[in-house]
Amino acid sequence: MTSDETLAVLIRYLDNPNPTVEEAVEVFTPMTIGEYDDVHIAALLATIRTRGETFADIAGAAKAFLNAGRPFPVPGTGVLDTAGTGGDGANTINITTGASLVAAAGGLKVVKHGNRSVSSKSGSADVLEALNIPLDLDPERAQRWFEASNFTFLFAPAYNPAIAHAQPVRKALKVPTIFNVLGPLLSPVRPEFQIMGVANPRHGQMLTEVFRELGRTRALVVHGAGTDEIAVHGTTQVWELKADGEIISYEITPEELGVERCDLTDLVGGDGVENARHMRAIFDGTGPAAHRNAVAVNAGAMFYLNSQADSLREGTAHALSLINDGTVADWLKTHEEIDYRG
């Protein structure tokens, strides 16, 4: 039951068109511990949606839920996390997930913080499970898997259980809310580097500013021709947080990345099992060029962000070489055969 004191905090926030980050932390913290009735959660989410999410809304909510979350027992220094908002409706193969595996095979430290499918046929957890990559590891075993392979998957509900307090309301509302952009910001490892794909480009600049507020050293927010990843079917909008704190924005095409343009229909996938088959085909050299290139340009951004490449184009070329010479296929074969649950 919402207390009078908590209700007063909520009302002040609902009446404030320009809240501060600190005020947002204050209003979202009761939600993380179940102090709001569902009707008050709905009022908060609907108000923010109606007036439009602000930098303070997103940064403050992220800080509140990170404070309530369970951290992963690995320092974030040198670690990269990558996730997208989803919701683009494209139902592509799991491009960002595949790119994460390429990056790990290439020596980057990658944490994939994600969930099962919400708006598509296959979420990151669905395809990784079909690739025999462990999902249900406790923190100690997940750390062991990470140290052995440079990669681990952190199942979002296990590390951010406070999100569950808002789930009934989100399901009942059946409209996008601030939580649709919040999830990727809540990485339990507090990574130094992060790439986030957004389905709605209007969030690009704001989310890059949020990454700066959350202490990321470098970050990329991308929107690729209607999808929440770097596109090989069209032009990608990029917002880049540089190491000195400057934020720049630009566009990049498949041709500038050094790959052929394709149609979005060439990238349509299926469920987790089908997308895992596509992933293996990419890595063993039997898959379509469009699939390989889509994974490579997104992995290339990871190499660029971690200063392993001087440009997105150079990063793409490096990712393609790792796929073409069998490095990624060998990496996957090695680590799917080891049982990290014991």
UniProtKB/Swiss-Prot annotation:
The keyword Secreted does not apply. Mg(2+) 2 binds at residues 228-229. The keyword Acyltransferase does not apply. Gene3D superfamilies: Nucleoside phosphorylase/phosphoribosyltransferase catalytic domain, Transferase, Pyrimidine Nucleoside Phosphorylase, Chain C. SUPFAM superfamilies: Nucleoside phosphorylase/phosphoribosyltransferase catalytic domain, Nucleoside phosphorylase/phosphoribosyltransferase N-terminal domain. GO terms for cellular component: cytosol. Binds 2 magnesium ions per monomer. 5-phospho-alpha-D-ribose 1-diphosphate binds at residues 84, 87-88, 92, 94-97, 112-120, 124. Anthranilate 2 binds at residue 170. Keywords: Amino-acid biosynthesis, Aromatic amino acid biosynthesis, Glycosyltransferase, Magnesium, Metal-binding, Transferase, Tryptophan biosynthesis. One of its GO terms (molecular function) is magnesium ion binding. Mg(2+) 1 binds at residues 96, 229. It comes from the Bacteria. It catalyses: N-(5-phospho-beta-D-ribosyl)anthranilate + diphosphate = 5-phospho-alpha-D-ribose 1-diphosphate + anthranilate. Coiled coil: none annotated. Anthranilate 1 binds at residues 84, 115. Its cofactor is Mg(2+). InterPro entries: Anthranilate_Pribosyl_Tfrase (IPR005940), Glycosyl_Trfase_fam3 (IPR000312), Glycosyl_Trfase_fam3_N_dom (IPR017459), Glycosyl_Trfase_fam3_N_dom_sf (IPR036320), Nuc_phospho_transferase (IPR035902). Catalyzes the transfer of the phosphoribosyl group of 5-phosphorylribose-1-pyrophosphate (PRPP) to anthranilate to yield N-(5'-phosphoribosyl)-anthranilate (PRA). Belongs to the anthranilate phosphoribosyltransferase family. This is Anthranilate phosphoribosyltransferase. The lineage of its organism: Bacteria, Bacillati, Actinomycetota, Actinomycetes, Mycobacteriales. The gene is trpD.
